[in-house]
Amino acid sequence: MLGDEKEGTSAIPGFNQIQFEGFYRFIDQGLIEELAKFPKIEDIDHEIEFQLFVETYQLVEPLIKERDAVYESLTYSSELYVSAGLIWKTSRNMQEQRIFIGNIPLMNSLGTSIVNGIYRIVINQILQSPGIYYQSELDHNGISVYTGTIISDWGGRLELEIDKKARIWARVSRKQKISILVLSSAMGLNLREILENVCYPEIFLSFLTDKEKKKIGSKENAILEFYQQFSCVGGDPIFSESLCKELQKKFFHQRCELGRIGRRNINWRLNLNIPQNNIFLLPRDVLAAADHLIGMKFGMGTLDDMNHLKNKRIRSVADLLQDQLGLALARLENVVKGTISGAIRHKLIPTPQNLVTSTPLTTTYESFFGLHPLSQVLDRTNPLTQIVHGRKLSYLGPGGLTGRTANFRIRDIHPSHYGRICPIDTSEGINVGLIGSLSIHARIGDWGSLESPFYELFEKSKKARIRMLFLSPSQDEYYMIAAGNSLALNRGIQEEQAVPARYRQEFLTIAWEEVHLRSIFPFQYFSIGASLIPFIEHNDANRALMSSNMQRQAVPLSRSEKCIVGTGLERQVALDSGVPAIAEHEGKILYTDTEKIVFSGNGDTLSIPLIMYQRSNKNTCMHQKPQVRRGKCIKKGQILADGAATVGGELALGKNILVAYMPWEGYNFEDAVLISECLVYGDIYTSFHIRKYEIQTHVTTQGPERITKEIPHLEGRLLRNLDKNGIVMLGSWVETGDILVGKLTPQVAKESSYAPEDRLLRAILGIQVSTSKETCLKLPIGGRGRVIDVRWVQKKGGSSYNPEIIRVYISQKREIKVGDKVAGRHGNKGIISKILPRQDMPYLQDGRPVDMVFNPLGVPSRMNVGQIFECSLGLAGSLLDRHYRIAPFDERYEQEASRKLVFSELYEASKQTANPWVFEPEYPGKSRIFDGRTGDPFEQPVIIGKPYILKLIHQVDDKIHGRSSGHYALVTQQPLRGRSKQGGQRVGEMEVWALEGFGVAHILQEMLTYKSDHIRARQEVLGTTIIGGTIPKPEDAPESFRLLVRELRSLALELNHFLVSEKNFQINRKEV
């Protein structure tokens, strides 16, 4: 963060900065800390000693480029080398060598890592900070029970509780508790030392019975009592060294290691001055905690709010990577110990290089990036998605909460989130409130706390000076903080008025002179997604949440367009996403085409490769378009090429289109949207999608699989696009069912399946006739398109464990269709219900037909009025050829500021274009429009405008599905479930109720028998349908009913069913 003391201005920090700082901290500090902890390893006879020399570690630059790592499914990593020494104590000789410890995945310029060719990102986790927390709960009698919970660095808990007789207990498990005296004695104190170190010795003496005195008579007795209660062991255990080690390992290491953050928190909470390097829980801590608990019981001290951010810490990328390095080095230690003992047993002379293997470190990091819940595949739908993904904060993950167990209080917005965690941007569904997003200016402090910047206001010799402070959640409670959305521009007016301020989590109204701090920026409280919503202050928070989530689902369009109405953050989001190509220094363009830009600068000639039709992991198209011409001089930081969803270096997710808010023949009922065919034929909402299909070749027991064009028993038209090697040719147009890669898998045929001539060859010449099964890669349903890339990846040492992989990339051009999802930036989403001819669409007074018709009933009940402001201002901007960048909370300048701005711009547009219908004083913002089918004006004036509308990734091509025949489940004999398995219609309990409610007995019987799981009946249906006969009624029960009977029989319950004749009520028993 850049701060200027004189002017009080600040620059927005880089949006990827959190990730970069975390990784830098790991490389700069965490790596050395973990290597320094690696112990000296000796053999059993103490003759050989192995140690690492941390000061000389070295990370080597990667041998491959990022792009190659993605295409060849490799990891973009750096090799770690450390000097190691092997000392022979008898001769005092030392052999020192530089050894390779393993590969550490590196972070690229996007703040992500490439592991096995996949972009992965590590997100930050919020955990309960280690320390002590005091709380009170009501017991079943309605009496307050006070507890103090000590949380260790590993998340282990030790609870101290005080009962109604003022006796203090330490709870070691859910059911078992021991006296605080026994715990203190087991930690090494005697009774005299305990009483000397507490504030209330008389309370401790009050529950000291003869039985307790015996338990704490010696340290051994106390440890035995503690062990008995902790391990729930009966009888009389005997004190031993192994018992102490077990207690140390299972209890003290897990629940008493505080770490440096825990030590700092306990010192602050209990007013102790124990050195910071003492990271374990001491007897003095326990006694001070007990004293504090007694004070709580008698009304002294304050309880802790567990959901306050001062009681949370951020586990960043640095902490997670450091933990994994510690785990890998612990594994390496075991390997070295085993290798030394093996070398001595076989009388071999070891060297440092022979002792160390790179496997533990490399495999630990690969499994961390591949399996850890906080390591996620980077969502690359559009530039905004990439940026926002790295700024997520999660309560989930190891040591955290789960979606099932988290209560409402944890999910709720807390006053301490102000300026640190966005109150709007969170996920919808079960994880609501558990996955948040960092506010724009928030940063992670040295102690794992979230810090937010404020301007400090103070006067010195009557000259106001401003200084910027970064405050942690525990610090800003002591200041009066003026809210940034209530500051007028005119300081003279400011000093006279009372302003709303925040103090100790309460909102007050105070005089301006009493303000200590003020916010630095109107967007300070919001995440990036919420900050891109114009007029957000006029929207309901739920709709703003939906909007910030839906902007991340917007598909990059083939021809992007900047928004007319924005917030001003669009440029920074685009630049920090890394999507546009930017000049690193000034120079002159020498050559440019679609693949590269060559320019000279600083005496060098640089070639910048451009991304061409690259697939993102959401199948969207990443493509860069040059924006500079040959011979042009450029400056540092200038845009050389625009990427997907950027225009001129600004984020451009959607299109400004002409919209009317009116009902139209019921086609926009329940959020449906009506569109004009202009949007289809003009390629307004056309997007490109790239799908990847891959096939592997293995070495089977019968021999290797072959890639070939010669595939028997297949029609020639299916193989028409294959080249001589059996792989589809570049540029081919492929349809569903076409062969992309021809492959044959060898298999052994049975004797009876051989043709007579084959048997003759075997009998006379002994020739083994091989048969092969066709296992080609075929294009699935909905995959038609143009082949744009083919990659044949051959791993080194092509063994059966390293199969060859062939990847085929197919590009699809998708126009907007009925069933696609579109949305605005205010949570106003809808599905396209009908595409009208342009001549039938409602048209304006100047003859222009409207592009899209929204339902006006979607606005009042949802309270997202911001869309109306944006709509009208967009119309004015398109007529005046202006773009607007509006900060939120503009009402801080004057009342009704948004409405005044919109009306004044509409009035100006009306004057300049000489179109009085743009601003009509009787109904400003609305206009009389005409029905395209009849030419008659509609009864009511209608709001028209140009909002920014996005096309979302939820497209009908990915979702529509039908099946005539397909696979059935073996057990229930019902159609499989889901589009991916070519599944069919499954009729459940609620569907049956719905059909029963309408009384459609015959349809219901069909659904439950022929169309579902009646095996014989569904076989007969086809034949009777072909010959035009009547479908016979099924005589016995369907398979699911028979399955139910079998399950009941397994529970020893016999169920019979009978058929009752309609004529004579004769009962015929049928066997299931």
Swiss-Prot record:
UniProt key word Disulfide bond: no
Membrane-crossing residue ranges in chain numbering: none
Enzyme type, top EC level: transferase
Name recorded for this polypeptide: DNA-directed RNA polymerase subunit beta
GO cellular component terms, semicolon-separated: chloroplast; chloroplast nucleoid; DNA-directed RNA polymerase complex; mitochondrion
Catalytic activity: RNA(n) + a ribonucleoside 5'-triphosphate = RNA(n+1) + diphosphate
Alphabetical list of NCBIfam families matching this protein: PRK00405.1
Annotated keywords: Chloroplast, DNA-directed RNA polymerase, Nucleotidyltransferase, Plastid, Transcription, Transferase
GO MF, one example: DNA binding
Subunit record text: In plastids the minimal PEP RNA polymerase catalytic core is composed of four subunits: alpha, beta, beta', and beta''. When a (nuclear-encoded) sigma factor is associated with the core the holoenzyme is formed, which can initiate transcription.
A single GO BP: DNA-templated transcription elongation
